[in-house]
Amino acid sequence: VGLTFDTGALIGLERSRHLMRKVYDVAVSHDVRITVPSVVIAEWWRAGEQEKARAKILRSVVVEPVSELIARLAGVALTLNPRAQTIDALVMASASLRPNEVIYTSDPNDLEMLRDCVPQFNSVRIERA
């Protein structure tokens, strides 16, 4: 099992929300891989007083670049669900390449709609951050 964090999950972790702090602490203590697609960082990262805390979080996760395969899977998802957001499609595509992956998100409904319309995404579990 591995975890993928989207922007909402990172915000929850940064703000020390109980659920995300617990998920993160358990994952780190059990050497569970936490993946953050690189596009999520662009949506989450802001300059300012929290940069050191954000950098510390980033050092503890695997930042995954968007490969051509991920981009194509996301494009298929956007074809099948034109109302979906590009970053959500990229997060789902990224997670779908790892078996037994769980995505933590603040928008489970958006990701569930993508999962339901793209067969390659069916194995991804989605949890509220």
Task: Enumerate the language-model features and the residues they cover.
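Short, well-structured N-terminal submotif of metal-dependent ribonuclease cores
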Residues: 1-36, 45-61, 127-129
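Acidic, PIN/NYN-like endoribonuclease modules and their adjacent C-terminal/linker elements
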Residues: 2, 97-129
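Alpha-helix capping/helix-boundary segments
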Residues: 9-10, 40, 70, 90-91, ...
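Short, flexible loop segments at the rims of nucleotide/cofactor-binding pockets, characterized by
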Residues: 10-14, 41-43, 79-83
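Short beta-strand scaffold positions
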Residues: 36, 65, 86, 105-106
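Acidic catalytic patch
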Residues: 40, 61-81
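Acidic, metal-associated active-site segment
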Residues: 44, 85-102, 110
